[in-house]
Amino acid sequence: MGNRVSREDFEWVYTDQPHATRRQEILAKYPEIKSLMKPDSNLIWIVIMMVLTQFVAFYLVKDLDWKWVLFWAYAFGSCVNHSMTLAIHEVSHNSAFGHYKAMWNRWFGIFANLPIGVPYSVSFKRYHMDHHRYLGADGIDVDIPTDFEGWFFCTTFRKFIWVILQPLFYAFRPLFINPKPISYLEIINTVIQITFDIVVYYVLGVKSLVYMLAASLFGLGLHPISGHFIAEHYMFLKGHETYSYYGPLNLLTFNVGYHNEHHDFPNIPGKSLPLVRKIAAEYYDNLPHYNSWIKVLYDFVTDDTISPYSRMKRHLKGNEVQE
């Protein structure tokens, strides 16, 4: 159903990603930006409150009719759980406790993972560092869709289904593109998460468990906040690899919309990225950006020139990939 997209392959490029060069230029001109490279202690308390909020929600939905369980999973839980994945993104950059307490960040990420229902935090950190270091690298950056995704999800209707199923593709794509040996922290993350899920089931019942899992599935699928998955790096304009979003949903997502700023300065917490843009305005104001993630989702589905193939991809230079 729907028109078939015109693109039949990724956009292969033979230049380095732009972020390292821009970072060097900005720091040379505005060295005061280095003062923003420090942890955000407020993140700790925000995450704790979000976790406790979902714990209360688990209790409140345990005796509701199923239709209301699913309603609140989408209307409320999805926003909290998607926001929590972006809190975990912040924690993966050591923004909670700083780089000198890296393990504190790993344990805190496992704690933040609890209301999501699926072990995620430790694996995300491992793959996300590759995404920054090797942006668009073939066989390394698992943020890039597989060839199957680009080939199959090539009509309006299929792209719509792809948007709904995004959490599943993000979960299983690493196994096909860049499988890594399981680490002991991933095992710990999994054991703690499964134990927590079992406790929720036995103490509160199946409805609370379904609410938790459905909130994650809904929030990471067809949801306004999920527009950031596509907005960040899908090539709506030829030659532009990363795009920022400056709309109101940044308030719920730890400023993940400031994505050019984030890739330029991954050591700066999300709360300070607007300051980066303000200080170095001439580097960002003229870059293409978005003001609506909902429009991004709509345009992705309906535009016949855009598909999962609409990503800039590059061959890895050299053979060494750092863990």
Curated annotation (Swiss-Prot):
Annotated family: Belongs to the fatty acid desaturase type 1 family. DEGS subfamily.
UniProt main location, coarse: mitochondrion
Membrane disposition: Multi-pass membrane protein
Keyword flag Transmembrane helix: yes
Motif annotated as Histidine box-2, chain positions: 128-132
Role noted for this protein: Has sphingolipid-delta-4-desaturase activity. Converts D-erythro-sphinganine to D-erythro-sphingosine (E-sphing-4-enine). Catalyzes the equilibrium isomerization of retinols.
Entry-annotated residues carrying Phosphoserine: 307
Catalysed reaction, written as an equation: an N-acylsphinganine + 2 Fe(II)-[cytochrome b5] + O2 + 2 H(+) = an N-acylsphing-4-enine + 2 Fe(III)-[cytochrome b5] + 2 H2O; all-trans-retinol = 11-cis-retinol; all-trans-retinol = 9-cis-retinol; all-trans-retinol = 13-cis-retinol
Gene: DEGS1
Protein name in the entry: Sphingolipid delta(4)-desaturase DES1
Cell compartment(s), UniProt: Mitochondrion membrane; Endoplasmic reticulum membrane
Lipid anchor positions (N-myristoyl glycine): 2
Family matches, as InterPro entries: DES1/DES2, FA_desaturase_dom, Sphingolipid_d4-desaturase_N
Top-rank lineage group of the source organism: Eukaryota
Chain positions of motif Histidine box-3: 259-263
Enzyme Commission number(s) of this protein: 1.14.19.17, 5.2.1.-
Molecular-function GO terms, alphabetical: cis-trans isomerase activity; retinol isomerase activity; sphingolipid delta-4 desaturase activity
Organism encoding this protein: Bos taurus
Keywords: Endoplasmic reticulum, Fatty acid biosynthesis, Fatty acid metabolism, Isomerase, Lipid biosynthesis, Lipid metabolism, Lipoprotein, Membrane, Mitochondrion, Myristate, Oxidoreductase, Phosphoprotein, Transmembrane, Transmembrane helix
Membrane-crossing residue ranges in chain numbering: 41-61, 68-88, 102-122, 152-172, 184-204, 209-229
